[in-house]
Regions:
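Secondary-structure end/capping motifs
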Residues: 246-322
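Short, solvent-exposed loop/beta-turn-alpha elements that line the ligand-binding surface or hinge
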Residues: 59-68, 226-230, 296-305
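Short, glycine-/small- and polar/acidic-enriched structural segments
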Residues: 34-173, 178-182, 200-206, 231-232
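Hydrophobic core
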Residues: 19-27
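Pocket-lining segment of extracytoplasmic ligand-binding domains
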Residues: 169, 175-177, 181, 186-279
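Conserved C-terminal helix/tail region of periplasmic/extracytoplasmic solute-binding proteins
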Residues: 315-342
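Bacterial N-terminal signal peptides that target proteins for export
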Residues: 2-18
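Sec/Tat signal peptide C-region and signal peptidase I cleavage site
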Residues: 28-32
Length: 342
């Protein structure tokens, strides 16, 4: 045996473990598994993510599956911004309302195939006004401005359109759109509480709606999303591309397991969950009010999607999405954790 052939064999033996490890990685994502970039927004509707972050549940579930997960957290405002971040590759998992999920599912149908990963729970969204003259949708005038996270595409915007369509017919679904204005929840809540700006109403989410009702004596509820949707429904969901799910199976599974663990923790320990929220969000709300919000019997902490199809049918009916979903399963990934959804 020549020295050259001997060296070649030694080199092959030395490289064999490296080549084997590389062959086991998903194609095109040698560095992807174990990295997770999550975009959330504002409010208690993201509590499960706050608990998962505070308790390091994603990292814990990753270790149980043999992968060290590095989690990056980003906070954005509005479903449109979240969707742009997802499609640009800036994030791996998006957190937003059901309406932005349906928008991006429709937009990527047959391409990136974005679908829902899990729900973050069912919460009532309240349309709150500080204008004593506004008690119903019919009472809004051109002097009123309704703040919401994103005009047209946010879940609040779509629920408002659905409520308008129920009152005046589908052809009039955008009747109040001219009164809406995009504003992050914290800023909108501050405006409604102060009562000194053009923002007289806010289609909010907890805890901001609770703060408004508690801190401005003129603030009152004009509309409850549960009434519009026919019962409790998932307020906020998480979604990702088909590619990310396929190329990062252990990271994805760990993430879903961490969410389920966070939901169980929150149901069993609402006050500890409130403390986690306060730590992650650096305060910003009275603890007693926050605990009251978390314990609200209308609130359900679960990763299982609930009553999302009503909005999906409406968006197809008015032409907001081009692809008609036959059931909620069309726009959610098929996972055991969410199998009993709707």
């Amino acid at each position: 045996m020549t020295s050259h052939s001997s060296f070649t064999q030694r080199l092959r033996r030395a490289l064999a473990p490296v080549l084997l490890a590389a062959s086991l990685l998903p194609a095109g994502s040698a560095h992807a598994e174990g990295k997770l970039r999550i975009a959330e927004q504002y409010g208690v509707v993201y509590l499960l993510l706050n608990v998962a972050q505070d308790q390091h549940l994603i990292e814990k579930q990753g270790k149980a599956r043999g992968v060290d997960i590095q989690v990056e957290w980003t906070r954005l405002s509005g479903g449109a911004n979240v969707n742009d971040a997802l499609l640009s590759g800036a994030i791996d998992v998006a957190g937003a309302g059901v309406a932005p999920l349906l928008t991006v599912w429709d937009r990527t149908h047959g391409r990136q195939n974005v679908k829902g990963v899990a729900s973050l729970g069912s919460f009532p969204y309240l349309l709150v006004s500080n204008n004593p003259a506004v008690r119903t949708l019919a009472d809004f005038t051109d002097k009123d401005r309704i703040a919401l996270p994103a005009v047209t595409v946010s879940v609040q915007a779509r629920i408002l359109q659905l409520a308008v369509a129920k009152q005046w017919g589908d052809k009039e679904f955008n009747r109040l759109d001219r009164l809406t204005q995009a504003l992050p929840h914290p800023d909108a809540a501050a405006a409604v509480i102060a009562g000194k700006t053009e923002i007289t109403s806010h289609f909010a989410s907890p805890p901001f709606q609770d703060q408004e009702l508690a801190l401005n004596r003129n603030a009152h509820v004009v509309l409850n999303s549960y009434d519009v949707l026919g019962g409790p429904s998932s307020a906020t969901v998480l979604y990702a591309t088909e590619k990310f799910r396929a190329e990062n199976p252990r990271t994805y599974a760990a993430f879903v397991a961490a969410l389920a663990e966070a939901a169980a923790f929150t149901r069993a320990n609402p006050e500890a969950a409130a403390d986690a929220y306060l730590r992650i969000n650096k305060g910003g709300i009275d603890r007693a009010l926050l605990v009251k919000t978390i314990k609200d019997p209308q609130v359900h902490f679960t990763v299982v999607p609930q009553n999302t199809f009503t909005l999906a049918q409406f968006l197809y009916r008015i032409g907001a999405i081009k692809h008609q979903p036959r059931s909620w399963r069309d726009y959610f990934f098929d996972d055991a954790a969410t199998a009993n959804g709707s």
